[in-house]
């Protein structure tokens, strides 16, 4: 206990000459790191339980004493500041001109997407980010052994609830609510979550958009035409597109949609030397998905597609690191305008 009292007296003497709050905080942090933290290291190394318990009580007393001295000194500095110093801001100085802000690049992309779907009378829906396994997986024909359902890939809150891994969890709810309509057009967008390690091209949270269009007269040619028009709206009319056969549990057939790289003719870093850039997934809604929404797949056909908002923004603006969108660095954000 003598050692503890010496440390307390030392701290009291150390802060006695401090004359501002910022210096007080820095002084306390340095003192604790130098004199207190090593004692906790010693505590962890003790093996005898009784000795460890007694030493732990002394360290708790030390922490409380240091915090009490810190708060007393801080209160004293506040009083001195009120009595002796002028206000930090001179209200008589004329204000500087306000600088116009700018819209976040992800919101710019969302606005552009919404403009396109409004022209085709789509209903925009927004559902909670906390969803059930029924809406996120079961209704979308995603089997129990699918990797996306594992706890290593998905953020579960309970056995039956999770943070949505795609916006389709909300879109399927929307078409189910409209299942008596002869023509159903729904778009959903918002945050989705995957248990990924954050790096230049991956994020545990990102934005996604998807749409479903259900009608008795739709076909594969309608899907190709509509997706092509969407890509032209987002990237311009001069890009070639291609549809590659793929597999998604909720569509059959399924396609990955690529656009010709606008940065090169023979391969570059952007297209990974392939001359093509993957844009989105699409397909004809699987009959089981329509049945889950209580829609007769013998009478109705659905087309669907989904895309990452960050991916569009990165491709449109040659951004190489997805994390730039989330650092809130105004130097980055102010570059983008409608």
Swiss-Prot record:
How would you summarize the oligomeric state and partners of this protein? Tetramer of two alpha and two beta subunits.
Q: How is the cofactor bound?
A: Binds 2 magnesium ions per tetramer.
Respond yes or no to whether keyword Nucleotide-binding is given for this record.
yes
Chain sites annotated for binding Mg(2+): 252
Any single GO BP term: phenylalanyl-tRNA aminoacylation
Query: What protein name applies here?
Result: Phenylalanine--tRNA ligase alpha subunit
**Localization per record:** Cytoplasm
Write one Gene Ontology MF term. Answer: ATP binding
Q: Which cofactor does it need?
A: Mg(2+)
Q: Which HAMAP family match?
A: Phe_tRNA_synth_alpha1 (MF_00281)
Q: Does the keyword Chaperone apply?
A: no
| This enzyme's EC code(s) | 6.1.1.20
Task: From the record, give the transmembrane residue ranges.
Answer: none
Keywords on record: Aminoacyl-tRNA synthetase, ATP-binding, Cytoplasm, Ligase, Magnesium, Metal-binding, Nucleotide-binding, Protein biosynthesis
Its UniProt entry gives the catalysed reaction(s) as: tRNA(Phe) + L-phenylalanine + ATP = L-phenylalanyl-tRNA(Phe) + AMP + diphosphate + H(+)
């Amino acid at each position: 206990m003598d050692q503890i009292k010496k440390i307390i007296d030392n701290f009291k003497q150390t802060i006695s000459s401090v004359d501002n709050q910022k210096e007080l905080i820095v002084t306390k942090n340095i003192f604790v790191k130098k004199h207190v933290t090593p004692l906790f290291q010693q505590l962890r190394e003790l093996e005898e339980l009784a000795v460890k318990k007694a030493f732990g009580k002394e360290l708790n007393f030390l922490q409380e004493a240091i915090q009490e001295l810190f708060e007393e000194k801080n209160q004293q500095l506040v009083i001195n500041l009120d009595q002796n110093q002028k206000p930090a801001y001179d209200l008589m100085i004329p204000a500087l001109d306000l600088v116009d802000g700018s819209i976040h690049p992800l919101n710019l992309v969302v606005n552009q997407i919404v403009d396109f779907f409004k022209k085709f009378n789509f209903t925009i829906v927004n559902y909670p980010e906390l969803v059930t396994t029924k809406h996120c997986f079961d209704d979308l024909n995603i089997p129990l052994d699918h990797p996306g359902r594992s706890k290593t890939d998905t953020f579960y809150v309970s056995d039956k609830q999770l943070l949505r891994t795609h916006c389709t969890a909300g879109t399927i709810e929307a078409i189910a609510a409209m299942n008596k309509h002869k023509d159903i057009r729904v778009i959903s967008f918002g945050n989705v979550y995957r248990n990924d390690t954050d790096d230049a091209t991956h994020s545990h949270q990102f934005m996604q958009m998807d749409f479903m269009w259900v009608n008795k007269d739709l076909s594969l040619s309608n899907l190709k035409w509509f997706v092509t028009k969407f890509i032209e709206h987002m990237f311009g009319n001069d890009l070639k597109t291609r549809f590659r056969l793929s597999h998604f549990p909720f569509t059959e057939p399924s396609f990955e949609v690529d656009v010709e790289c606008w940065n090169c003719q023979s391969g570059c870093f952007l297209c990974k030397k392939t001359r093509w850039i993957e844009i989105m997934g699409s397909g004809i809604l699987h009959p089981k998905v329509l049945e889950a929404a209580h829609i007769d797949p013998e009478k109705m056909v659905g087309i669907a597609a989904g895309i990452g908002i960050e991916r569009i923004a990165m491709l449109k603006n040659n951004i190489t690191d997805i994390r730039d969108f989330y650092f809130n660095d105004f130097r980055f954000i102010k570059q983008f305008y409608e």
